[in-house]
Design a protein with these regions (language model features):
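ATP/NTP phosphate-donor binding region
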Residues: 1-17
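A short, small-residue-rich loop immediately preceding and capping a beta-strand
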Residues: 13-33, 37-46
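A glycine/threonine-rich phosphate-anchoring loop and its flanking beta-alpha core
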Residues: 35-135
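Short, well-ordered alpha-helices that flank and scaffold nucleotide-derived cofactor binding pockets
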Residues: 9, 32-35, 186, 190
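Short, intrinsically disordered, charge-balanced linker/junction segments flanking boundaries
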Residues: 1-4, 223-227
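Active-site segments that bind and position negatively charged phosphate/pyrophosphate groups
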Residues: 124-226
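Generic hydrophobic alpha-helical membrane-span motif
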Residues: 30, 51, 86, 187-188
Length: 227
């Protein structure tokens, strides 16, 4: 957070808009700067690597942990499919992980409800679980096309991520979308620090397989989709 504040302090007063061109990290930095300077933010993603392009939050690291800062959403998002389509295959559609984590998110959410570990605000809601499960099912269906850079599949991915973000915003929490796979991702990051952090999907993917296995799920379809 302190580094982001330093960047914000260095923004000249005559700047009227912040443009972010790149992946999820670039988007987060742009949103944070726009929020601190109270100016519009325009993001042009070069990959569909995560759902952060569409959220009102920024994931900022401080003291070895990740904190979420509510900055508000971007003012405008410009998607050029020719740019997305030609991105490196390993990150081009990596945002599909945001839909696959629904699998463990829902399993953890139901488990917590069965053991009276939810709050009034995060109580299990079958209607929401049903909708989110449908989004995850669609992710498995489009995965092959996303991996091949098929524009229609990438459009589907973008729409599904938007719906996922919209529903979690409506619920006011991420229980149906994120699960215990996140614990693995953050633990790995702490145990094996790197000068350049691993992409989000690369950290969460193994955790997703572990969490699903702990719930007794067949991880074959998930492994194939991640591949």
């Amino acid at each position: 957070v302190s580094y982001l504040d330093t960047l914000a302090d260095a923004v000249p007063p005559q700047v009227e808009v912040v443009y972010g061109v790149g992946g999820g990290l670039v988007s987060d930095v742009a949103k944070y700067l726009g929020w601190k300077k109270n100016i519009p933010v325009v993001v042009i993603p070069t990959v569909l690597s995560q759902d952060g392009f569409f959220t009102a939050l920024v994931a900022a690291r401080q003291g070895g942990t990740t904190h979420y800062v509510e900055t508000g959403p971007v003012s405008k998002l410009i998607v050029n499919w020719d740019v997305i389509r030609t991105a490196p295959p390993n990150v081009r559609g990596a945002g599909i992980i945001e839909l696959l984590t629904i699998v463990t998110g829902l399993l953890d959410w139901r488990y917590a409800a069965e053991h009276n570990k939810t709050t009034v605000d995060t109580r299990f809601q079958p209607w929401a679980a049903g909708i989110m499960a449908g989004l995850a099912q669609q992710a498995f269906k489009i995965a092959s096309g996303v991996g091949k850079g098929n524009i229609e599949s990438l459009r589907n991915l973008l729409d599904l991520m938007c719906l996922e973000v919209q529903l979690t915003n409506q619920l006011g929490h991420n229980r149906p979308q994120e699960g215990s796979e996140q614990l693995f991702a953050y633990a790995y990051e702490q145990k094996f620090p790197r000068s350049r952090p691993l992409p989000y999907a690369d950290r969460v993917g193994p955790g997703l397989l572990i969490a699903a296995s702990l719930h007794g799920q067949d991880v074959g379809p998930i492994r194939e989709t991640l591949a």
